[in-house]
Amino acid sequence: MSQTSSESQSLITPTFVFAWLVNFAQFTVFYLLVTIMAMYAIEQFQASDTAGGFASSAFVVGATIARLFSGYIVDAVGRKRTLVVSLIVVTIAMALYFPAQSLPLLFVVRILHGLGYAIASTAVMAVAQSVIPDHRRAEGTGYFALGTTLATAFGPAAGLAIVHNAGYNAVFIVALTLTVVALALGLVVKAPAQEQRSVTFSLGNIVHPAVAPFGVFILFVGVAYTGIITFLNGYSSDVGLEEGASYFFLAYAVVSLFLRFVLGKLQDRRGDNIIIYLS
């Protein structure tokens, strides 16, 4: 087998590793902030529980809006260019947390951060998928998603620990540092050239009856999990179990990490249905 052919069949390549690191940094920042944001709004701006919850979920509002057209942007502009520009937007948004000294400004920053984050995560996923061999697609996607799984353990636990020991500004500094690292990695990652073709945007790009059941299923799962991570910090403080909140995310990540190594190969061999039934 030639060197070129061997490289084309390899799963762990420099492009894949850089994309993995960008994804891990992005999700770590997300979990660092989402876990502490409701309490930050309540303590810093005397927000109600509802407003504090929106301070956390405003990020998701921005991300949801961006998801509607992020795929089109990646196809039209290109994977690498979209990744770099969106990471710049994320870095700017992250820096704006420091001067955002009112609740409305915090909402705006959270929405802007979510917009950039959603486009960046779509672009980095496209970069990773472009170098995963077809016959190892599910396995490679599972390994790539390990970054998200690890972030669910490290991000919330680190966010809670930093807040309790050094305050909210320290969390923002750590998050900004990770964002800058992600931008630096995004600048050096090499994405394969894309085929030049005309791309048009239509309602069919974002709405398709065939995927509606899957979307509703993920919606319910996401709502349940987001509710937990948004208010877990405040709840654990109220009942005197601050350390227990960190263990929750650790247990979640350990189980997810183990399953990632198993389910990707199982999906490649047995198909999608068995994974859905098990989950």
Language-model segments: which ranges?
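Helix-loop boundary and gating motifs at the non-cytosolic
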Residues: 12-45, 52, 225-235
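Short hydrophobic/alpha-helical segments at membrane-entry points of transmembrane helices
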Residues: 19, 104-110, 214
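Extracytoplasmic gate region of multi-pass secondary transporters
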Residues: 34-35, 213-248
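Helix-breaking motifs and short loop linkers at transmembrane-helix boundaries and internal kinks
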Residues: 46, 78, 99-104, 271
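Residue-level signature of mid-helix packing/kink "hotspots" within the transmembrane helices
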Residues: 60-68, 152-153, 253-261
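Conserved MFS/SLC helix-loop-helix module at the cytosolic interface between two early adjacent transmembrane helices
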Residues: 65-98
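Cytoplasmic helix-loop-helix junction between adjacent transmembrane helices
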Residues: 109-147
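C-terminal membrane-cytosol helix-exit motif in multi-pass small-molecule transporters
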Residues: 176-195
